[in-house]
């Protein structure tokens, strides 16, 4: 009987407890905010009272494993597509397409560079909702013939306050309010490059400003009566490594500049050979002990970074803290782009809102999992991607964490355990000596009879 009750309970939980879509009658609303270059351990190294309050009332992921290369454009596009760089096509901040023979720079607004994937703001609009963007990389580009309902073209002179004010206005406007918005802010990346993440005094100043920005966002959402109804994700694209003017690899010390074109550099360099590829490879392979050289086909599978025409024949990857250039000096003391296994390259994630648990902490997730999470919250059907909701759903409320396939496995396991226990009990009973429950009364001759 107990076994039957257990099985029924498991099946009930698997069938009815899991929330596949948000249950609010109104359209779910979501903001994702990226603070560029926010290294995960900044949270433990610097005081951030506003962000602490935000996470106390919501969830925190201590580290987010981002995609390779750990640069701004590839990772911001991965966040909104759930794809690795080789799949969404924005493989670097600067690119050369070997098929079309065209060059991409960060201010390029030609949709052909972005149309290998579909960002969530386009999917949200195609499924009947409204999207807005405050300077997120790529959102000013009309992708797949879809233009955002509300947007701010990138302009670094627009303050954080102005960006937030626009988003709250878009969310609350009486006609065509949006239900999804992205916000991008340049810090602490700019200061991390300039001073390096180990410069405590200077980084403390900029991170204090970042924390004040979080406080401003919270106060504006409360003022607009959005705090309890809008879901907010705060994250970043990458971390930052400490560098030095003494740790610079100059390629022209190893190979003549006429032998190659440097498509993207520092600290991951994309090389297009202009002469014999094998010769260029051999010269670069022996160039410096702190630089690894890969042919395109030899790039490690774990980076998901080889199957695209915008990835060059040779890839140079510097060790953490080293920088690659052609022949000039570099003044910055912090950089990113390195191996995405490095903790220094990882950002964090914090989230708050009706879809999220309160006071919950998780060790790590993959950045490509954030896309299916956002689709789930918005109640839209996401496009094929490299992420999975399974690994991140515990951040959400109303989740029993047991899906139907998992429940079937548990039920089968429970049946096996109960069957084994039953067999053991039967065997033990057979081995026990037989005793009669009531023995016949034995009368001695001197006993008084019970019946006279």
From Swiss-Prot:
Annotated membrane topology: Single-pass type I membrane protein
One Pfam family per UniProt: Phosphodiest
InterPro entries: Alkaline_phosphatase_core_sf, Phosphodiest/P_Trfase
Keyword DNA-binding recorded: no
GO molecular function: bis(5'-adenosyl)-triphosphatase activity; metal ion binding
Residues involved in Zn(2+) 2 binding: 189, 193, 336
Reactions accelerated catalytically: P(1),P(3)-bis(5'-adenosyl) triphosphate + H2O = AMP + ADP + 2 H(+)
Residues the record lists as binding substrate: 93, 154, 189
Transmembrane domains' residue ranges: 408-428
Cofactor: Zn(2+)
Its EC number(s): 3.6.1.29
Keywords of the record: Blood coagulation, Cell membrane, Disulfide bond, Glycoprotein, Hemostasis, Hydrolase, Membrane, Metal-binding, Signal, Transmembrane, Transmembrane helix, Zinc
Gene Ontology cellular component annotations, sorted alphabetically: plasma membrane
Subcellular location: Cell membrane
Membrane side Cytoplasmic: residue ranges: 429-452
Cysteines paired by S-S bonds: 254-287
Cofactor binding: number and manner: Binds 2 Zn(2+) ions per subunit.
UniProt enzyme class: hydrolase
Its job: Hydrolyzes extracellular Ap3A into AMP and ADP, and Ap4A into AMP and ATP. Ap3A and Ap4A are diadenosine polyphosphates thought to induce proliferation of vascular smooth muscle cells. Acts as a procoagulant, mediating platelet aggregation at the site of nascent thrombus via release of ADP from Ap3A and activation of ADP receptors.
UniProt family annotation: Belongs to the nucleotide pyrophosphatase/phosphodiesterase family.
Protein name: Bis(5'-adenosyl)-triphosphatase enpp4
Gene source species: Xenopus tropicalis
Source organism phylogeny: Eukaryota, Metazoa, Chordata, Craniata, Vertebrata
Gene: enpp4
